[in-house]
């Protein structure tokens, strides 16, 4: 959903004043229709913003993607959308996700879930009605924040405070979280470079290094997609200054050993190479 709504910006620097920002997001997007159809499905149906879009609103970043969580089951979501003639597709239904399309934009609507088992790449899940259970399966506290369209937060792991204080904390046991999905090694790097105001915790780094071999089990597509996000958000210059993050990257992508050459290029040359995906080959 690139350039979503010409990249909405939120001007306030006050993390306690997000209600208006979320209301603005709701009013300026087609997502309001989805809230309406889900909330009207039954007296007990609920739907909330979740994850990256809330994190970005809190941090005054541009919102380029909207994810939603609901206590409705996928088939019920389909029924609700169908009733109002909202287009959708079910390619992610095995994982509890229905993708609605309105005005050419996509909105992922995912049923609350609980992990049953995982092989380090994909989790087997069962559907849930429990918001805290759903939050507990997420990777970091800053990604486990939910909000209704009025801006009322559900934040069981104090992700808002962690974001405000520049803390990147795993939810629960670090080793378990990483083993559930080895991509979280790279996600830690991305979020640490972007949000942390503190040194790395040695115990976290130890767990990341212990589990880093598991990253090789992931698909090339998932790895490169996450690497692109790291570069896009943080730039190689920022990565170069963090020796621990750089060490982890080099353990995964040995091709990066000569990336200092890239740092010596001027901005125009860097932009050209990024456009042709040179640095991801």
Where are these predicted regions, by residue range?
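Catalytic cores of the polymerase beta-like nucleotidyltransferase superfamily
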Residues: 1-281
